[in-house]
């Protein structure tokens, strides 16, 4: 197995320009493909997850032109021209869920599948929602999971669509993005959410991007959404993808642990991504954080003892960035508790189990619950730990931070960061100093 040895490092400082947001990139690609007109996208993320979306759109007949700086998408005016396609979507939830919904109303015969882990990630709640409007979707293997066969169907809406919100917000995102393509008698479609909606900021991203493409969603709190029916997305002409706020979390934490100053550019106060809230969590732990419209800077920890404060926090709104807090908890002066992180269980790996296992390798005492993690840091980090990454990009990036604790660490399968941030370790090494 490939591995990468990091550290020991004693400081981290500098400036990093973030790659484009994965969540925004794949949403914008699909909206541009479904829109009327041509869209020029700048700062599109170049990663495994965006490549599978681009490949799928190409197979569906979408004309795409890409160079080093831009991606130009010729919209299909709401209907893919390819009526049959076999689509491999890797482990990209941001591609599988929205594309499944769009294909279900497109009137073709499609197969959607991915890597083995994707076939363990639930999609049943989305399929149930789509079946309520007549979609014909079959499971090839296990009920509730990909691979899927999608067949032509007569789509009709005569009642509110109900969808669970407590497993993944991507099911609701997929419905919201697709339903404008569907006709309804009174010109609108109501979606009602069962249970508490998790990861609400990601729904906010979806709604804001739909607005950029000319479609306005009304919402009543986070339980009821009204989508205009039978309308057409319109290209905004040009759209820039802001930096990835989840990826920012590793560098911001490095600025705290390594003294800084460390500035990330591409996200800030003006960001539409909820994961900029990570900066607030870091401030609660005692880090010195400042922020502009499109930058965030961290200058070490505001304590003489040099340790972060422990944190007890509900991370429902920022589950991805919360992984970075779990590793930062190794550097705290006491026990930290991460609550409401059940969605970790159905991500690229079971992140609660994986995080607990790897933190223990570094000497931490960890209590693992169904939707929480309690981390008590060791007196001293265990040097030369070998961290398994479970083919999960965020596990690899999070645990790079251990090297700032003055101990070397080995990261197995470092190339898994290709899912969202292919040159992460080069960027990290340029900022970390022995």
Swiss-Prot record:
Pathway: Metabolic intermediate biosynthesis; chorismate biosynthesis; chorismate from D-erythrose 4-phosphate and phosphoenolpyruvate: step 6/7. InterPro entries: Enolpyruvate_Tfrase_dom, Enolpyruvate_Tfrase_sf, EPSP_synthase, EPSP_synthase_CS, RNA3'P_cycl/enolpyr_Trfase_a/b. PROSITE patterns: EPSP_SYNTHASE_1, EPSP_SYNTHASE_2. It is an enzyme of class 2 (transferase). One of its GO terms (cellular component) is cytoplasm. It is found in: Cytoplasm. 3-phosphoshikimate binds at residues 22-23, 27, 168-170, 199, 320, 347. It comes from the Bacteria. It catalyses: 3-phosphoshikimate + phosphoenolpyruvate = 5-O-(1-carboxyvinyl)-3-phosphoshikimate + phosphate. Its main location: cytoplasm. The active site is at residue 320. Catalyzes the transfer of the enolpyruvyl moiety of phosphoenolpyruvate (PEP) to the 5-hydroxyl of shikimate-3-phosphate (S3P) to produce enolpyruvyl shikimate-3-phosphate and inorganic phosphate. PANTHER family: AROM/DEHYDROQUINATE SYNTHASE (PTHR21090), PENTAFUNCTIONAL AROM POLYPEPTIDE (PTHR21090:SF5). Monomer. Belongs to the EPSP synthase family. This is 3-phosphoshikimate 1-carboxyvinyltransferase. The gene is aroA.
